[in-house]
Amino acid sequence: MASTFKITFLGTGGSVPKPGRGLPAIAVQVDNIVNLFDCGEGTQKQFMKSGVSFMNVKNIFISHFHGDHFFGLPGLLSTFSFNGRIDDLNIFGPPGTIDEIKKVLSLIDFKITYNIKIAEMEENKKYDFDLFDVYAIKNDHTKYGYSYKLKEKDLIKINREKADSIGFPKNKLELLRNNGEYYYMGKRYSIWDVADGIKPGRSIVYSGDTRPFNDMLKFASNCDVLIHDSTMDASIENLANEYGHSTARQAAEIALKANVKRLFLFHYSSRYNDLNLLLNEAKSIFNDSYLSREMLEFNVDKKTELIKI
């Protein structure tokens, strides 16, 4: 399992920036791989203020193509080249992503020094990134968009005594773990022959811009961290929903029903100078609710439970 599993909030506002509150961008670091969820205007500058190296960004996931979620791409992609990047970059998003990213690239009038791979993700399909998997589902916004889940791979705990009892060599256990099976002395061994149980991986769900929708309950079920659209407060719920957003109360209701461990409110309307109104509203429903703040880092702890098999 990964040694580092860390969220850094680079921008937490919605639509219009404010001093100290930039546009949506979230870095999720899994060991030395940085995954960027959305890239609002000024994201590259936010990286420079943070403790996260933008040169380690390997994957970018765009939730939808409203400007506040991707206008930071031209600058960031340009700066990669200015800094001599040669490593491949992957950009993922909903249907239409390929055309939108081509438009972004047309704004850059010098040579890109690295290869950019663009992919339109399919709903509910598992995308394998070695240490973790990423899933996407369509949410409920005014523009076609995705919610994302990044889930660390489960760790199969090996029982060395079981291996000894069936005559499987200890120096081949990692090969068995990595491949799921291994042939030794003409006999096929399965990882389950020596497994003691499963340590579940950590998981983060990012809603993107969305009204509340039922599929989120299953998608976010039991996740460690839910980062959810909380654009407005409950007194203007109809307005929030009309514009394809959620209130802090609605985000908390989803967190409660989905049995998540922690909720971070996100994508605040610029009408709010004091965010405690949103926080208190959420906490009245789901106590483990927190405000996302720029440069806030949150390390997701490894799970200690072992699911016996």
Curated annotation (Swiss-Prot):
<feature type="binding site">
    <location>
        <position position="69"/>
    </location>
    <ligand>
        <name>Zn(2+) 2</name>
    </ligand>
</feature>
<dbReference type="InterPro" id="IPR013471">
    <property type="entry name" value="RNase_Z/BN"/>
</dbReference>
<dbReference type="Pfam" id="PF00753">
    <property type="entry name" value="Lactamase_B"/>
</dbReference>
<keyword id="KW-0862">Zinc</keyword>
<feature type="binding site">
    <location>
        <position position="267"/>
    </location>
    <ligand>
        <name>Zn(2+) 2</name>
    </ligand>
</feature>
<feature type="binding site">
    <location>
        <position position="209"/>
    </location>
    <ligand>
        <name>Zn(2+) 1</name>
    </ligand>
</feature>
<comment type="similarity">
    <text>Belongs to the RNase Z family.</text>
</comment>
<keyword id="KW-0378">Hydrolase</keyword>
<comment type="subunit">
    <text>Homodimer.</text>
</comment>
<keyword id="KW-0540">Nuclease</keyword>
<feature type="binding site">
    <location>
        <position position="68"/>
    </location>
    <ligand>
        <name>Zn(2+) 2</name>
    </ligand>
</feature>
<comment type="function">
    <text>Zinc phosphodiesterase, which displays some tRNA 3'-processing endonuclease activity. Probably involved in tRNA maturation, by removing a 3'-trailer from precursor tRNA.</text>
</comment>
<keyword id="KW-0819">tRNA processing</keyword>
<dbReference type="GO" id="GO:0008270">
    <property type="term" value="F:zinc ion binding"/>
</dbReference>
<feature type="binding site">
    <location>
        <position position="141"/>
    </location>
    <ligand>
        <name>Zn(2+) 1</name>
    </ligand>
</feature>
<feature type="binding site">
    <location>
        <position position="209"/>
    </location>
    <ligand>
        <name>Zn(2+) 2</name>
    </ligand>
</feature>
<dbReference type="Pfam" id="PF12706">
    <property type="entry name" value="Lactamase_B_2"/>
</dbReference>
<dbReference type="GO" id="GO:0042781">
    <property type="term" value="F:3'-tRNA processing endoribonuclease activity"/>
</dbReference>
<dbReference type="InterPro" id="IPR036866">
    <property type="entry name" value="RibonucZ/Hydroxyglut_hydro"/>
</dbReference>
<dbReference type="InterPro" id="IPR001279">
    <property type="entry name" value="Metallo-B-lactamas"/>
</dbReference>
<protein>
    <recommendedName>
        <fullName>Ribonuclease Z</fullName>
        <ecNumber>3.1.26.11</ecNumber>
    </recommendedName>
</protein>
<feature type="binding site">
    <location>
        <position position="64"/>
    </location>
    <ligand>
        <name>Zn(2+) 1</name>
    </ligand>
</feature>
<feature type="active site" description="Proton acceptor">
    <location>
        <position position="68"/>
    </location>
</feature>
<keyword id="KW-0255">Endonuclease</keyword>
<feature type="binding site">
    <location>
        <position position="66"/>
    </location>
    <ligand>
        <name>Zn(2+) 1</name>
    </ligand>
</feature>
<keyword id="KW-0479">Metal-binding</keyword>
